[in-house]
Amino acid sequence: MDALPLVQTDAGQRLVGHLLRHHRRYLSGAIDPDVRFRDFQNHVVHVDEGYWGGAPRVAHQWYDRMLRYLRTDRFSDAAHAAGVLSHYFTDPMQPLHTHSCDLEAVIHRPLEWSILQSYESILADWKSDDMRVVFRLSDRSEWLGEAVLHGARFANHKLARLLA
């Protein structure tokens, strides 16, 4: 939801309106991959293991589903699909979702809990940082998968610092 103010196109603003109107469905969709689907192999892109993981594929599936719902005026369902999509899109941007090892398994939950507890501070720091990462999305049909893979590669560069 924090990214919604960054949306700039008219079509994007219409989608933002639907997401805000159906925010409960959006938010429930955002946690469904963890609590309902529990398909954790689809939350990752292991960069150093030949890009193993299903995040790009499943993100495309939920994106297509969201578009189908939008075209048929099923805006509540579209908001839910957008929430699910947001999970599969952002999880590979967490460095520990880009590699698997024994140490990663030990620190994963505590790190995610710490991020959750510090989220407001992290967001404020990001907003005030002139060096923050904002990437533009392509108009090409492959844009979504490319963005997920790019995010995973970027996150993977931060992995060694977390595991040190």
Predicted segments — roles?
Residues 87:
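Divalent metal-coordination and catalytic microenvironments
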Residues 1-80, 95-164:
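N-terminal, motif-rich segments that launch catalysis or mediate targeting to/interaction with membranes
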Residues 83:
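Active-site nucleophile-His-acid catalytic modules used for acyl/amide transfer and hydrolysis
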Residues 90-94:
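Short active-site segment of divalent metal-dependent hydrolases/proteases
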